[in-house]
Amino acid sequence: MATPGAASAELVIGWCIFGLLLLAILAFCWIYVRKYQSRRESEVVSTITAIFSLAIALITSALLPVDIFLVSYMKNQNGTFKDWANANVSRQIEDTVLYGYYTLYSVILFCVFFWIPFVYFYYEEKDDDDTSKCTQIKTALKYTLGFVVICALLLLVGAFVPLNVPNNKNSTEWEKVKFLFEELGSSHGLAALSFSISSLTLIGMLAAITYTAYGMSALPLNLIKGTRSAAYERLENTEDIEEVEQHIQTIKSKSKDGRPLPARDKRALKQFEERLRTLKKRERHLEFIENSWWTKFCGALRPLKIIWGIFFILVALLFVISLFLSNLDKALHSAGIDSGFIIFGANLSNPLNMLLPLLQTVFPLDYILITIIIMYFIFTSMAGIRNIGIWFFWIRLYKIRRGRTRPQALLFLCMILLLIVLHTSYMIYSLAPQYVMYGSQNYLIETNITSDNHKGNSTLSVPKRCDADAPEDQCTVTRTYLFLHKFWFFSAAYYFGNWAFLGVFLIGLIVSCCKGKKSVIEGVDEDSDISDDEPSVYSV
């Protein structure tokens, strides 16, 4: 018989893996932010803020497999609870995860609504050399106050918004919906926190639709297509230089006799001279790229990039198929929009929903897969942001360039990634709803068996995978799932957002297929902050 210490042992295993992953996350965030920040405009506070905010989001997402691991390890594969998993211990373990979410989500609210806006506006004011540091802080606090007010409003609305599902539904499914809404508790503080985080997750959904969906198609196709040849681009650039020089010479020849140039020719001459400066700058960068050992090294890795591109597009198709089947299942079998399209049981199986519970039985294989999925979303989101840029409606605010991203753009970048990572938890639920809800838990059901040797029927207890049909005391729902479904209207918005995600992915796939190869120095024409003596890092 297992001793009470087994509970502590199981808990320690899950949290030890979480601790190791935490260290890996911090290392990844430091490398990632340092890779993109500008070398000439690097600021310590903005760098630390970007690393910390991105790390908090990733750590929160890393709590998902810990949550699933702990509820799964309360039960044996035969559907019975383990000896140590009595009601008090189960509640204690669940509360441990819940307190983890409380802490991390509170820190996220602090970062999004106070610290990141404050640092951003501080550096916006710092660009003005005439202002003192005290004035910069006061101005930054004044603008940040608006974000604090928004956060306070979200907390107030979340604390008192009605959670009751419609009472005109009498079916057993609606009783289950009501149970799920009430399971996490009726605390106003918890409801306020959940509402605020769900609001941020909704914004993250919009960012995922804009950037991640496009990046999932752009990243693999860019790897497969590669970039244009530096030598060929340099040849074309040389021809353009000669052509522009001829135009300049033609215009200047009109004033050889001392006559002043007409205003039209002056404007044309100015444009050609500006164009010539840009072309010569491109010439220097192309020459550097062509002779670089890094270019030759990347050329040798070209077959590997093609293989990675094919792998990424296959993974993208796997996600899209799983998401489509999951959403179709909700459309056909859910309890409706008033329940947030909550689904009871998997009527249409999808690949990830079948794979994750199998991997979960061999810890930490599912942890590894979840980490890969989250990292995949991060890299595809980054690819989308690099291709599209950061926009406010039709105005481009910032470009994201490796080694050339300004402090303000870096904060924007990490804010967007933070919101996308928040939405990742719901994306994983959409891809594998049964896994996120119950993990690998089984419960016992009574089955009647007719025996030829004995008159009458006998009953046999057989294990069955946990689903919404299971008795409430036989299966433990993850805290993550309950956080995601505290408010039904957010779940409904996520459902429609998934369809939009699929649509944007298909559009991005078509656009990426139609676009030609990227320039080996793409962006050099637009980057006014590139100095002539700094031709370094480009994507090759």
Swiss-Prot record:
PTM sites of type Phosphothreonine: 238
Motif extent (WTKF motif): 294-297
Main location: membrane
GO biological process, one term: protein localization to lysosome
GO molecular function annotations of the record: AP-2 adaptor complex binding; clathrin heavy chain binding; cobalamin binding
Keywords from the UniProt entry: Cell membrane, Cobalamin, Cobalt, Cytoplasmic vesicle, Developmental protein, Endocytosis, Gastrulation, Glycoprotein, Lysosome, Membrane, Phosphoprotein, Transmembrane, Transmembrane helix, Transport
UniProt-listed Pfam families: LMBR1
Post-translational modification: N-glycosylated.
Entry annotated with the keyword Phosphoprotein: yes
Residues in the Extracellular compartment per record: 1-10, 72-100, 166-188, 327-364, 430-486
GO CC annotations, alphabetized: clathrin-coated endocytic vesicle; clathrin-coated vesicle; endoplasmic reticulum membrane; lysosomal membrane; plasma membrane
Cytoplasmic compartment spans: 32-50, 122-144, 210-305, 386-408, 508-540
Ranges spanned by the short sequence motif YERL motif, renumbered to the chain: 232-235
Subcellular location: Lysosome membrane; Cell membrane; Cytoplasmic vesicle, Clathrin-coated vesicle
Residues recorded as bearing Phosphoserine in the entry: 528, 531
Transmembrane domains' residue ranges: 11-31, 51-71, 101-121, 145-165, 189-209, 306-326, 365-385, 409-429, 487-507
Glycan-carrying positions: 78, 88, 170, 347, 448, 457
Disulfide bonds: none
UniProt function note: Lysosomal membrane chaperone required to export cobalamin (vitamin B12) from lysosome to the cytosol, allowing its conversion to cofactors. Targets ABCD4 transporter from the endoplasmic reticulum to the lysosomal membrane. Then forms a complex with lysosomal transporter ABCD4 and cytoplasmic MMACHC to transport cobalamin across the lysosomal membrane. Acts as an adapter protein which plays an important role in mediating and regulating the internalization of the insulin receptor (INSR). Involved in clathrin-mediated endocytosis of INSR via its interaction with adapter protein complex 2.
Assembly notes: Interacts with ABCD4; this interaction induces the translocation of ABCD4 from the endoplasmic reticulum to the lysosome. Interacts with ABCD4 and MMACHC; this interaction ensures the transport of cobalamin from the lysosome to the cytoplasm. Interacts with INSR, adapter protein complex 2 and clathrin heavy chain.
Family statement drawn from the similarity comment of this UniProt entry: Belongs to the LIMR family. LMBRD1 subfamily.
Protein name as it appears in the record: Lysosomal cobalamin transport escort protein LMBD1
Native source organism of the sequence: Macaca fascicularis (Crab-eating macaque)
